Amino acid sequence: MEMKEQLAYPKERIRYAVLSFFLAQGLCFSSWASRIPDVKAMFDVYDVFYWGLVLFLIPVGKFVAIPLAGFLVSRLGSRIMVQASVFGYALSLFLIGAVSSIYALGACLFFFGVFWNMCDISLNTQGIVIELSLIHI
């Protein structure tokens, strides 16, 4: 978000907008975390090693997203990236519950990790810009 764009809105409104995105991100993750046993049972995965490999795709996606998120935030701005990444994060969460194959689940978990980290990076970038504007003005 550019500094000029921020000043067009009241400071409290800006703070609450960013806070609401952090809240939405936390709700998405807690929704997934509470459903892990159900998803495991849905796919009849009883091998702990195999299930661990499937779940490991989340941090792999997060790792892959680090350079991608930095590039996109610098190109498009944190405001657009927050909106796009929250949408992708919620969509991947929906798809986790809708897939019928363990391989599709793995792909959804990978993209869940990608959008989760893109959301983290763009939200924190947005938060830094807002914090600086609130302190210096």
Identify what each model region corresponds to:
Residues 53-70:
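Central cavity-lining transmembrane alpha-helices of secondary-active solute carriers
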Residues 34-48:
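Short amphipathic helix-loop junctions that connect adjacent transmembrane helices
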